[in-house]
Structures are given as C-alpha cells and as structure tokens.
Regions:
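Conserved N-terminal entry element of GNAT/NAT acetyltransferase domains
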Residues: 1-9
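Conserved active-site tyrosine of GNAT-family acetyltransferases
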Residues: 17, 110-111, 115
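A conserved beta-strand-loop-helix scaffold within acyl/acetyltransferase catalytic domains
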Residues: 32-35, 43-45, 52-61, 66
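A conserved beta-turn-beta hairpin within the catalytic core of GNAT-like acetyltransferases
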Residues: 56-64, 73, 125-129
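Conserved acetyl-CoA pyrophosphate-binding loop and the N-cap/start of the following alpha-helix
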Residues: 72, 76-84
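Conserved GNAT acetyl-CoA-binding A-motif
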Residues: 89-102
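Conserved catalytic-core motifs of GNAT/GCN5-like acyltransferases
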Residues: 98-100, 116-132
C-alpha cells in the first residue's frame, strides 16, 4: 500500500471514495430515499433570479442553498422561497430543518423565521463565523 497526498482531487478519486461511503451508509440508514427539492424564480427570459436547493430525507429537510439576486432582495422573495420549501417538506413528512450559513450571509433572516442556532464555528475560515441552525416544523 502507498499513501498519496494531493492538493488536486481528481473526480474519479472523489467518486471512488463517495461510492464507498455511500455503500457503507446505505447498509445502515433506515431511510434510503432522499428526495431533491428545487424551487426557482425565473425572469421573463428564463434566467434564474432566485432559488432554493435542498433535500428531504426522512424527518429532515436540509437546506443546501437559498439565493436571491440583488434586485429582488428585501422584497419578500427569500421568505417566499423558504415558506414554500418548508410547506413541501411538511407534505413530505419532514419534522425538522437543518442549514448552515456564514455570518456575512443570513443568520438574522433565518432567526426571524424561527430557526435556532445549534452551534457555530468561530474564526471560519479565518476571521468569520459559520452558523448551523435547526427548526422544528
């Protein structure tokens, strides 16, 4: 056996490790069927100007991305996306939501909607903070 260290991760190597981990996890998880959830707002030209990407898995909705373009910020667009995602998650049987956000992103936004900070990473990546939130639906 040989130990290799790299700063350039090849897709094939990443896929091999991911597939090994996935096989291990699927043998142990009770719910093996995560379902993607994408909600997009498009302009008249079909360009995405705001959107939500997450996944529902068992009791949980995991929020991966929630983004609103500059021109739509502070007009209720983010709230609309979040409410819709939570509604769909409930319909899918979810009881909780989990997300992470940086200090310069939207912690106050999520707190306004009942999300509670579970923990935070200080000095991430250098001087900022990364927060992890949970909400009971």
């Amino acid at each position: 056996m040989e130990l290799e260290i790299t700063e350039k991760i090849e897709k094939q190597d990443q896929d091999t490790i991911f597939q090994g981990l996935l096989k291990y996890n699927l043998a142990r998880l009770e719910d093996k069927n995560p379902v993607d959830l994408g909600i997009y707002i498009r302009d008249k030209a079909g360009k995405i100007v705001a959107g939500f990407i997450g996944v529902t898995h068992g009791n949980w909705l995991s929020i991966k991305y929630l983004w609103v373009s500059e021109k739509l910020r502070y007009k209720g667009t983010g709230s609309q996306l979040l409410y819709k995602a939570e509604k769909i998650a409930k319909e899918r049987g979810c009881k909780y939501v989990f997300l992470d956000t940086f200090s310069f992103q939207a912690p106050k936004f999520y707190e306004k909607f009942g999300y509670h900070k579970v923990f935070s990473l200080e000095n991430y990546p250098l001087t900022g903070k990364r927060y992890y939130y949970r909400k009971i639906l």
